[in-house]
């Protein structure tokens, strides 16, 4: 806890026999960030109290941490951070409070301030020490505003750490700084400190800040309080001494924590995601289902994307389409993705070939034998879906899961075409599959809890985020999507200028404007969905 850390630091500082302190972790990560549910650090439990008292509690708690880190900086003893693994969020802010930072030379290690990704701002000096070390550049603003992590080498070139070394030499390198009489004072505490790159009121600084403000407004439409607070904290803080700057950061941190938008982001993007990774919503009474082979019916854009992310997880894929050329084209989708990664040195030829070897493009349904899961990804047409369902179920075992990637058609109705409706479930991916993290799992009227558990195990294996929803036309996401894009088209028909419609959509917090989104998903798809919906309503007498 923070209290235990404070007690240890105070003892080390007061012990005259201690000439310097090396901070390292006994775990694989140095520190991968603070616990965002910690009331000691963030005070989320106090937000529900009287607003003034809550703000005071959060501010005072934050300043306690700020003062603790300042005591390290001003102790007169050199502190060295030996970064053996990920140093993120508060973990990296501890490093920033050290006088020297040495990291293992490993590109898999992440160094960064990812708080903005979950709606918060660095709250232990990150907005003040980072720019004092590295200046305010486009790269550094991305580091803070977007939470983009650096590798140790990149952090070194940016000026955020002082040295990279081999794992075996990490502690020796850290000790060497102390033994060699390394400074025990931070640059900003030295007389004559000059801010790297120029302050905001210099000509160069004015250009940087004007561009940063404009870019932030363009990308966020002021919907994200954390990014605005980070920019303000840096702008104001770099113009005053460090102690005043840390108080500025603490005030902005308090303001952000008190903001309902930030609280919602923390809940959705951190707390709930942590719960999902631990099996929330998964039925508890069933063993883990290890999917080793799946069949994908339909090798179009969606089916091809599903094939890629599934093979990437090490699962064998049988990719079926009406003719061999179409199936081969579906596999080619994965080839193109991997070739692009290869050109950027994000994969190797060996890894590429291994992934592609897992995808078998074919027209032969008999190759589905032994599949643990089927994903149907054909057009939104009931007749076609019924046909491929029958062909696939004739080949698979009675325990295999059959999932439909339908975006709008009720699962209970589609399950009527199945010989085993208890094993039938909706698995709705989003395009492009390799980039979109969400998968919607839809429970039909007869879908069993075991089928739900198996499906959630598969979705987590391919590293997607599952949400479980009830069965109704459009489910959850497509109903939101349809309403959003439909309203945009309706406004256009009423004569409202497209630019106004698009800006209004972005101002609501949506990542893409409604008319642009309609174009991106293809208007013919909307027509097919509408046509099938009309047929269904007529059949139901509606």
Residue map of PLM features:
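Conserved CoA-thioester-binding segment of acyl-CoA-metabolizing enzymes
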Residues: 1-24
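Glycine- (often His-adjacent) and acidic-residue-rich active-site loop
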Residues: 25-68, 87, 117-119
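Short glycine/proline-centered loop/turn elements that form peptide/ligand docking sites
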Residues: 89, 107-114
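N-terminal glycine-rich phosphate-binding loop for ADP-containing cofactors
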Residues: 4, 42-45, 52-55, 61-62, ...
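Gly/Ser-rich catalytic serine loop of serine hydrolases
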Residues: 81-91
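Helix N-cap at the beta1-alpha1 junction of Rossmann-like dinucleotide-binding domains, i.e.
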Residues: 28, 108-110, 323-325
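Conserved catalytic cysteine-centered active-site region
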Residues: 68-81
């Amino acid at each position: 806890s923070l209290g235990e850390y404070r007690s240890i630091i105070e003892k080390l500082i007061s012990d005259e026999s201690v000439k310097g302190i090396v901070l390292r972790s006994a775990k694989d990560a140095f520190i991968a960030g603070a616990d965002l549910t910690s009331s000691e650090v963030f005070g989320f439990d106090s937000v529900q109290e009287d607003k003034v008292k809550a703000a005071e509690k959060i501010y005072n708690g934050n300043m306690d941490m700020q003062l603790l880190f300042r005591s390290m900086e001003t102790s007169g003893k050199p502190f060295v951070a030996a970064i053996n693994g990920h140093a993120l969020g508060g973990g990296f802010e501890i490093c920033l409070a050290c006088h020297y930072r040495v990291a293992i030379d490993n590109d898999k290690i992440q160094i960064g301030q990812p708080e903005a990704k979950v709606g918060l701002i660095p709250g232990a000096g990150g907005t003040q020490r980072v720019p004092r070390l590295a200046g305010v550049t486009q790269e550094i603003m991305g580091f803070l505003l977007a939470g983009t992590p650096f590798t140790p080498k990149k952090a070194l070139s940016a000026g955020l750490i002082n040295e990279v070394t081999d794992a075996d030499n990490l502690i020796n390198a850290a000790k060497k700084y102390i033994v060699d009489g390394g400074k025990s004072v931070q640059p900003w505490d030295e007389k004559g400190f000059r801010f790297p790159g120029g302050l905001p009121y210099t000509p160069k600084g004015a250009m940087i800040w004007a561009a940063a403000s404009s870019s932030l407004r363009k990308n966020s439409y002021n919907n994200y309080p954390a990014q605005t607070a980070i920019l303000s904290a840096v702008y104001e803080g770099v113009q005053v001494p460090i102690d005043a700057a840390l108080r500025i950061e603490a005030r902005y941190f308090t303001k952000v924590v008190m903001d309902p938008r930030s609280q919602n982001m923390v809940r959705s993007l951190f707390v709930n995601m942590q719960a999902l990774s631990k099996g929330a919503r998964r039925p508890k009474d069933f063993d883990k289902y290890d999917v080793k082979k799946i069949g994908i019916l339909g090798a179009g854009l969606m089916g091809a994307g599903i094939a890629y992310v599934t093979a990437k997880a090490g699962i064998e894929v049988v990719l079926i389409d009406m003719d061999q050329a179409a199936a081969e084209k579906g596999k080619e989708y994965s080839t193109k993705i991997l070739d692009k990664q290869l050109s950027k040195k994000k994969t190797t030829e060996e890894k590429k070939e291994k992934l592609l070897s897992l995808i078998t493009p074919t027209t032969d349904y008999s190759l589905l034998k032994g599949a643990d899961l089927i994903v149907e990804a054909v057009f939104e047409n009931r007749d076609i879906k019924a046909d491929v369902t029958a062909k696939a179920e004739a080949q698979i075992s009675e325990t295999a899961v059959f999932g439909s990637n339908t975006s709008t058609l009720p699962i209970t109705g589609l399950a009527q075409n199945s010989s085993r409706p208890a094993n039938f479930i909706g698995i709705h991916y989003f395009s492009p599959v390799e980039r979109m993290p969400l998968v919607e799992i839809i429970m039909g009227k007869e879908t069993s809890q075991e089928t739900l558990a198996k499906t959630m195990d598969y979705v987590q294996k391919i590293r997607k985020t599952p949400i479980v929803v009830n069965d109704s036309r459009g489910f959850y996401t497509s109903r939101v999507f349809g309403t959003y894009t439909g309203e945009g088209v309706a406004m256009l028909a009423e004569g409202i200028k497209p630019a106004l419609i698009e800006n209004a959509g972005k101002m609501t917090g949506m990542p893409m404007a409604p008319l642009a989104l309609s174009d991106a998903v293809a208007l013919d798809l909307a027509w097919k969905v509408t046509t099938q919906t009309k047929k269904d309503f007529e059949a139901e007498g509606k």
